[in-house]
């Protein structure tokens, strides 16, 4: 809760449309949404598209779609409107030049006419002297007359922030306490570029102020920029929002999450078949303790019980194994019919269905498959891949290959040998007989289990010797779903067809 809030709480997320929407955008959006929700406030989406060199066509729509997919809803934004728009920075272009020049008049910024050659020479000298790069304030002391003369002559310029040379700037960060910066170590940041476009620093502060943002919840990588932002607020005479810098998502080696080591595109997670509930739940565990060791929760539960002060700063590891576990929990919790509908496109991609339009009877069969396979699958894609046994009636037995590792070779040898073993052949023959005597085509799961277990009683052998050859002729594999579940789904006729095809194809002597 925000016990000191005097105004209506307003938070925002402000991604740039420069490619696929980033998982970090969803992470920061989630915490902004939860903070606004628990304080009866507003969460808005702003598109920061002033960097035209990196702008990617279609990226903005992908941001909208990704946030909506995850149910990370915003009450104001470019596609929904609002009282503080426009919400694209490119549509607010004239504002930034106006405020930059206003800041010059107030003495908080100045015109800089240094050309590219001078700035390059400055950087080279600083590098040779072992000094950190930064502007040297060359144009800071130009007289009013000199400035007017250059402006009249059309000399290209930028507008720079006039940072104090002395003293300190203190960030009052909600999670970290006071973070102190020496002003002398912060250079005069460009606010307005020569082409008239604002830098992030100017546009960000102007927009946050005009949109009434009360709390800036963003990644900790922005901490070094925050003293410049605080000085901008002071120079304008505006009240700064409260700053809350979230820990960065990390790879296993503690480096900042990047696409070289972890998928970062939200589109990838959707296409891989992660549920929105699973991904949002996982992001809610990043640097945050929900309480009482609870790790599985809904978005609504997260928002209702949110407390920003529970955020920890250790640098949460974005672990795909943990994400898979969380996602599996939500797959098991989800309504079976709804989960089946979500999985149908993945069955189509695997070639098990010709299209997504399935009959009522087909849907009921798919529900059986999904109900079985969701127990062990981490994603919808994995569920579909693991469901091969339920769909493919024509298959071949595996062959020994030179490139097999020891474990795989042993598994295949065991399967093939089971089809030569006397007990294995008896098992197949007796299984066929029992299927042919079965009244009707369908089984319940219990009936299928009882039929298979009756083989153990009749042959007085262990399950390994009996079920391995049956699995081989029923699926062509040495492992997979429980045999009784396969029988339960495919029924008597398909089971007999599979077995007889393999027996004939490989001349198995039963």
UniProtKB/Swiss-Prot annotation:
GO terms for biological process: glutamyl-tRNA aminoacylation. This is Glutamate--tRNA ligase. InterPro entries: aa-tRNA-synth_I_cd-bd, aa-tRNA-synth_I_codon-bd_sub2, aa-tRNA-synth_I_CS, aa_tRNA-synth_I_cd-bd_sf, Glu-tRNA-ligase_bac/mito, Glu/Gln-tRNA-synth, Glu/Gln-tRNA-synth_Ib_cat-dom, GluQ/Sye. One of its GO terms (molecular function) is glutamate-tRNA ligase activity. A motif ('KMSKS' region) lies at residues 256-260. ATP binds at residue 259. One of its GO terms (cellular component) is cytosol. Pfam families: Anticodon_2, tRNA-synt_1c. It catalyses: tRNA(Glu) + L-glutamate + ATP = L-glutamyl-tRNA(Glu) + AMP + diphosphate. The keyword Zinc does not apply. The keyword Ligase applies. Disulfide bonds: none annotated. Monomer. A motif ('HIGH' region) lies at residues 15-25. Keywords: Aminoacyl-tRNA synthetase, ATP-binding, Cytoplasm, Ligase, Nucleotide-binding, Protein biosynthesis.
